[in-house]
């Protein structure tokens, strides 16, 4: 068998105090939740462990424990415990290693081999197997450190070609020299060809010039500027001293998170080892966590932020000013909103901080006089939107011959606010139409106090994924409760909600919408329900919610640009959608008239296909939007349901508000040591609290006693169980123009209305347009 090797003399084995362990090898214990705890906030299935320390290095969490293996699973004790103890006896370890050395590989048990190669698995995978001696524990720690170093250079090693599917995107490859990472991601996301704004923007942006892009909603503006900056991120990944690549500013938090998600999807392989390279910094979330993430290596190379939170971070840490002053690209998404009141002051301070620091760096290094590349994108660029910012009346008195002259005026105004390297290149993919041609607009005329009823009618007649916009937060809250009382899944999002609750509500809406689509696809004969998201204008800009079929304007928007962005939540990525306005007669003579006149293009003309006359007359604003047909017999059957649901919604909201007011008053009184009951009479007599008393009395009038609430709910449930019938037909199912018996047997017709054909809002408007033509 050969001679035994003599043990090496003079060699001392150091016993490490700690070892790094994988979390899957730890003996986790489930956390017992007490029965008296009502709400655990969704944290179920938690596990805990003692005797383990947690260390975070560059965002990577590692678990460290001492050499006793009590915290390890039984399968790992043999591996870590016994083998490491045997290292203390050199002769014992040598003899065991020799036995393993001269064994046939077929005779070696799986446990022995794993124990022998526990700390050198990486070397075995490369085929460089050294002697099968048990490795010294001190070498375990050193090799773990070496592994981390290798992971940082993961992009320098060879790529397994078998893991990459062939890319066949000729339109993308002909557009610009894009990396394989981006092309692979575009193919996986099924973005097979670029949109119009992407075709015109990406090559120009990659040349480093300033760009001002205008395109309709849902046209792919995010990737138009996102692909070039992600290309820079990929090309700079191997550099050690990485400078920030891009700053992207958005007007809303939701839009910032959405842009972050879109950029991460097209560079997932890059983020696998540096997950914080693309970072979202918005309000409503922990600023301490954001400060900690910015300190990680290679983090924040692309930052998507709202101006308020980013300014707060800069003012708290001056090193961030120096760091982000070296940025290469500055991007303004939805720039028209960013430069309006409320955002521009913060944005101007940010630009001032960065420019001052950049000039200092340029003077010290004698670098180029060129500042960052500036990219501006929006769906609406109109000079009217900048009137509040301008102190000159010359802008208001201007009249423009065409759209290009108006955009040039906007650029002149922007150049006084934003620092460009030169006059930006204008890329306008919809010079004439302001609303996307894929959106079919419609008008619903209703009495001013019956908006809820007509909204319920639309959702019953045209079920689907619907987004409803309201001007007031109180309307959002009431409409949500109202629709839930009628059995329609409704979710809400508005500015009074915390950021966490906003994101949670959006996620629930998407899940419910996907669930309903799955049910309808698997069982087309099932009753189709509408899935509704009710929102204030906080969700009007930029949000890409997949599958929204209808947008309802519960109130007319306050400005034209808000209407354009609201309507743009449907008809995304080339699909079609419906935008319906609920309008009272009083609104039609004022706000509606102004809205339609502003939206009317200069080239809007009547198109008569049979007439060859060149004298075409402009279309009147009244004829630019068709009326949605309303069937009064169905509406009358919904009226009583709507009344009961509305009263119950008012009661629920008023009761919750009164309860919150009482709890707040009692809490404040306890903190001040005041007896609330003794002071109630004095408060009621005080003239200074007249407004509070009126508000309280108004809420009290909307409340209903418990017995009446139960009776109303029972009546409402009974009405909801009765199917709606077209023309109120209840007898002679085989008579009339439509054979109801035949439709019921063959499961044809509307799923919610007996005797009615299947309806689709989009097809209804298309048919009406054809009849009018």
Swiss-Prot record:
GO molecular function: ATP binding; ATP hydrolysis activity; RNA binding; RNA helicase activity
InterPro entries, A to Z: DEAD/DEAH_box_helicase_dom (IPR011545), DEAD_box_RNA_helicase (IPR050079), Helicase_ATP-bd (IPR014001), Helicase_C-like (IPR001650), P-loop_NTPase (IPR027417), RNA-helicase_DEAD-box_CS (IPR000629), RNA_helicase_DEAD_Q_motif (IPR014014)
Cell compartments where the protein resides: Nucleus, Nucleolus
Basic and acidic residues bias: start-end ranges: 73-82
Keywords: ATP-binding, Helicase, Hydrolase, Nucleotide-binding, Nucleus, Phosphoprotein, Ribosome biogenesis, RNA-binding, rRNA processing
A GO CC term assigned to this protein in UniProt: nucleolus
Entry note about domains: The Q motif is unique to and characteristic of the DEAD box family of RNA helicases and controls ATP binding and hydrolysis.
Protein name listed in UniProt: ATP-dependent RNA helicase MAK5
Organism: Saccharomyces cerevisiae (strain ATCC 204508 / S288c)
The organism's taxonomic lineage, starting at the top: Eukaryota, Fungi, Dikarya, Ascomycota, Saccharomycotina
């Amino acid at each position: 068998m050969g001679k035994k090797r003599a043990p090496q003399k003079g060699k001392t084995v150091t016993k490490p105090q700690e070892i790094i362990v994988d979390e899957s090898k730890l003996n986790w214990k489930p956390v017992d939740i007490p029965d008296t705890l009502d709400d655990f906030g969704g944290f179920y299935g938690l596990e805990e462990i003692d005797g383990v320390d947690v260390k975070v290095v560059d965002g990577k969490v590692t678990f460290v424990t001492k050499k006793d293996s009590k915290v390890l699973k039984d399968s790992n004790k043999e591996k870590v415990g016994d083998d490491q103890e045997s290292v203390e006896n050199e002769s014992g370890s040598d003899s065991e290693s020799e036995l393993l050395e001269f064994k046939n590989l077929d005779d070696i048990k799986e446990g022995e081999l794993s124990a022998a190669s526990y700390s050198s698995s990486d070397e075995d995978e490369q085929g460089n197997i050294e002697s099968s001696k048990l490795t010294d524990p001190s070498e375990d720690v050193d090799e773990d450190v070496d592994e981390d170093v290798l992971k940082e250079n993961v992009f320098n090693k060879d790529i397994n070609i078998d893991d990459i599917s062939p890319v066949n995107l000729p339109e993308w490859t002909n557009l610009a020299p894009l990396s394989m990472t981006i092309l692979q991601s575009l193919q996986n996301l099924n973005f097979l060809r670029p949109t119009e704004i992407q075709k015109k923007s990406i090559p120009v942006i990659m040349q480093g010039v300033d760009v001002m892009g205008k395109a309709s909603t849902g046209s792919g503006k995010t990737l138009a500027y996102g692909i070039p900056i992600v290309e820079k991120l990929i090309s700079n990944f191997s550099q050690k001293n990485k400078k920030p690549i891009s700053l992207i500013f958005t007007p809303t938090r939701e839009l910032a998170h959405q842009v972050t998600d879109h950029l991460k999807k097209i560079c997932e392989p890059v983020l696998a080892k540096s997950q914080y390279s693309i970072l979202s910094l918005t309000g409503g979330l922990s600023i301490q966590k954001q400060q900690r993430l910015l300190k990680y290596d290679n983090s924040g190379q692309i930052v998507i932020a709202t101006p308020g939170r980013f300014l707060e971070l800069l003012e708290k840490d001056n090193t961030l000013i120096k760091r982000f002053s070296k940025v290469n690209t500055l991007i303004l998404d939805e720039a028209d909103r960013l430069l309006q009141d409320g955002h521009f002051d913060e944005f101007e301070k940010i630009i001032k901080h960065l420019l001052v620091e950049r000039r200092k760096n340029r003077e010290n290094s004698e670098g180029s006089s060129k500042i960052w590349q500036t990219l501006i994108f929006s769906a609406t660029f109109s000079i009217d939107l900048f009137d509040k910012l301008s102190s000159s009346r010359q802008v208001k008195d201007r009249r423009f011959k065409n759209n290009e002259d108006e955009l040039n005026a906007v650029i002149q105004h922007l150049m006084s606010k934003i620092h460009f390297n030169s006059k930006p290149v204008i890329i306008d993919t919809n010079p004439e139409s302001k609303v996307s041609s894929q959106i079919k607009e419609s008008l619903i005329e209703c009495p001013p106090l019956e908006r809820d009823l007509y909204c319920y009618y639309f959702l019953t007649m045209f079920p689907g994924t619907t987004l409803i916009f309201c001007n007031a937060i109180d309307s959002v809250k009431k409409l949500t409760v109202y629709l839930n009382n009628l059995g329609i899944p409704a979710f809400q999002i508005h500015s009074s909600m915390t950021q966490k609750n906003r994101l949670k509500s959006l996620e629930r809406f998407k899940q419910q919408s996907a669930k309903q689509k799955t049910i309808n696809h698997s069982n087309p004969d099932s009753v189709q329900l509408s899935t509704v998201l009710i929102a204030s204008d906080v969700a009007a800009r930029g949000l890409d919610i997949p599958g929204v079929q209808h947008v309802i304007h519960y109130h007319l928007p306050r400005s034209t640009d808000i209407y354009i962005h609201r309507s743009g939540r449907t008809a995304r990525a080339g699909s079609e959608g419906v935008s319906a306005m609920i309008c009272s007669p009083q609104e039609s003579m004022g706000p509606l008239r102004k809205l339609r006149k502003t939206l009317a293009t200069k080239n809007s003309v009547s198109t008569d296909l049979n007439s060859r006359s060149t004298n075409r007359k402009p279309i009147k604003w009244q004829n630019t939007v068709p009326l949605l047909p309303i069937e009064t017999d169905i509406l009358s059957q919904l009226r009583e349901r709507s009344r009961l649901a509305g009263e119950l919604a008012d009661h629920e909201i008023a009761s919750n508000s009164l309860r919150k007011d009482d709890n707040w008053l009692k809490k404040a009184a306890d903190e001040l040591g005041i007896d609330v009951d003794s002071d109630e009479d004095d408060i009621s007599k005080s003239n200074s609290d007249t407004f509070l008393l009126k508000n309280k009395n108004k809420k009290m009038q909307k409340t209903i006693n418990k017995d009446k609430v139960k009776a109303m709910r029972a009546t409402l449930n009974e009405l909801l169980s009765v199917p709606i019938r077209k023309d109120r037909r209840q007898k002679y199912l085989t008579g009339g123009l439509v054979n109801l018996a035949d439709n019921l047997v063959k499961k044809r017709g509307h799923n919610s209305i007996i005797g009615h054909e299947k309806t689709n809002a989009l097809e209804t408007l298309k048919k009406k347009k054809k009849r009018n033509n």
